[in-house]
Amino acid sequence: MPKIYLSPSTQESNPYITGSGSEEYNMNRLADALEPYLYANGIRFVRNTPDMTAASSIAQANRLGGFDFYLALHSNAAAPDNSGSVRGVLVFYYPTSAEGKRAAELFAANLKRVYPLPDLVRTVPTTALGEGRQPK
């Protein structure tokens, strides 16, 4: 069975414009909602904690090793003049990873089913995220 590192945001100081809490709060709620599905499908996972940072989460995943996938749950902020007007979901993957692209496409397809603006869900190749060692 697959093993993933589940990494919801640790940015407590990034409040949502809607007043619904911080990025850390909301992304941890999303991770909480994912856990039953992971358990139900036999997917093993390790999860970071809110007192960690992005860097320490990546370091822990690298130190523990053996993960098939690193799932970072984050929301992006907008510049003050765009605050509250930018929407959508970006699913990032490493450009030369066929399996990473396939996983990103699967996530995006399922997110389109539940996101209120499915046309704003897309996959994006990138090399500019936190550096993690290649899984397995």
Predicted regions located by residue number:
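Active-site-proximal helix/loop segments of hydrolytic enzymes
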Residues: 2-4, 12-14, 25-136
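Flexible glycine-/small-residue-rich
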Residues: 8
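Periplasmic OmpA-like peptidoglycan-binding domain that tethers envelope proteins to the cell wall
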Residues: 19-23
